[in-house]
Each structure stands twice: as structure tokens, then as C-alpha cells.
């Protein structure tokens, strides 16, 4: 497994997450609300993906940063075992509170913190050449790292020059989607090898309400051989590559905490790609991984390798072509 450690590199946002819930409705200003469940954990899209890789028995190197405070030191300790290489920013560590609603949706309150200072200049000295063969770099949380975002096109070019295939998960922009933002993201999309977005992000990036129409608009933006994986929540995922389109249903599960669902999908999907799986099989792996991981609470109860059986190859007869 040692050689696998450098086949998947994860670059993006990490922070301290406090997940609380469930709540029904929104509390009246000035009141206190008691909730039944909580967990303090390493979070952020990049950390969630790295943790999911570990649960699945895989290895990755996580490149990010923490702040120069006690939460940053705690976060560093949580992530070191995942192969993390973390710069230290002269800023407080980014904190996020995730409120879980009774309907299953979630609301986040996030401080800007150290992620505002994380830069390409901090990252580049820690970025090694890709391992020979099939190596992937996953980029996530771009909108929470504004300084790094300014060098995103440069970063993608550098990753390709180092031998990586690039997977991109933009996440949702706090400033919402605008024409200028769509044009900026389009330059990253056209240079990426795997585009991993959820249904709302696909419709927003394409500026179309209908998902099928949005997929049809985005696929011509992909370079030859690149894939689009659309995460459709409890329904599963849709994939498109070079004119092929397929759909995979997600396993049914009782879910309390959906935080990190998309990141867990990314981990399963990319590990399957690294294992040589095709589009349909990789979508299935992503759906299995996400359903299994978000069904567990607290997440700290999942041991490294505890879900490694999910990486077993499935017969293609279990997949639904479209």
C-alpha cells in the first residue's frame, strides 16, 4: 500500500468543524436551543476527503494549512496520520459550525480564518512530482481559499506538468454564482480531468434549471477523455465521458449527518479510478462510500480501513446505463 500513498493528492480547505443537531425550524433571535447530538472533528472538504480515503483503506497526501493557535495545533494532530503536510498561517484557524436540520439539510457558519491566507507560494514547495503511472490530484474548497484561488489556473498547469491528472470539486461559492464567476470556473473545468459537482452546482454553473440540459451544456466544456460526475444526493450519481452517460443509484441508508457526503463520494470515486475502474463502476464506488460514511455518527467511530470492503469491484450488471 505504500506506493498508493502518493497516487492521490488532496489540496484544499481544512478547518475545525462542530456539527450539531437536529433542529426543526430556525431559533428565535436571543434564545437558546438544546440539541441531542454533536461532534467536534477535523473538517473542510479536503480533510473530509482524506478521512474518507482512510476509512476506505486507502492512502493520500493532504496539502493544506492551519492557523497558529490551539485549534490549529489540534487540527494538525488530527490530520498528521493521514499523510498531511500543513503550512502554518499567521492567522486564527478557520472554524465551522454545521447545523443539521430535521429535514436532513444542513446550514454552515464558517469563519474566514487561516484559509484566507493559504497561498500557492505556501503550497508549491510541498508539492512533489506525481508517482509513476496513474496519479490524481483532487482540488476542493477553492472559494474558501481566495489567495490560492487567484493562482488556480497556474496550480492546475503545474499539477499537469508534474504528472497528475486533476480532479476538481469547486463546492458552493459563498458569494453565489455570477456570470464572471462562471467564466472563471469554466477555465478550470476545461483543464480538469475529473469534474465532481453536485446537482445544484451543475445547474448553477450551467445557469440552467433543468439538470439534463445543464449536463448537456457542461460536457462540451470538458477536454477529451475528461469525466463529469454529478452527485444527486440520495438518488445517486450521473456520469458523462466522451459521449457515454450512465447513472448509478445510491444505497439506501438512514442518515443524520450529511456533512461531507460529496467529499466521501469523491474519495470512493477517485480510489476506484486509481484501481482501474471505468466510469460506471467508479460512480457506484462513490455512491457506496458516501452512503456508508454519512450513515455513521459520530464519524470518529470509523477506524482507518474500517470500510475497506467497499472498494471491492462490483459486477457491471448492478449499474444502470442511460
Spell out what each predicted region is:
Residues 1-63, 70-74, 256, 321-322:
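Glycine-rich phosphate/adenosyl-contacting loop at the front of the ribokinase-like
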Residues 2-9, 34, 158-161, 207-322:
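Conserved phosphate-binding/catalytic region of the ribokinase-like
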Residues 14, 142, 264:
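Active-site metal-binding loops of divalent metal-dependent hydrolases
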Residues 29-34, 40, 55-139, 311-322:
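Conserved N-terminal subdomain of the carbohydrate kinase-like
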Residues 53, 198, 262:
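Short, conserved phosphate/pyrophosphate- and ester-handling motifs at nucleotide-, phospho-/glycolipid
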Residues 60, 86, 166-167, 228:
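Hydrophobic beta-strand scaffold residues
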Residues 129-130, 187-188, 221:
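Structural alpha-helical scaffold elements that stabilize or flank donor/cofactor-binding regions
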Residues 136-216, 235-236:
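Conserved beta-alpha-beta core of the PfkB/ribokinase-like small-molecule kinase fold
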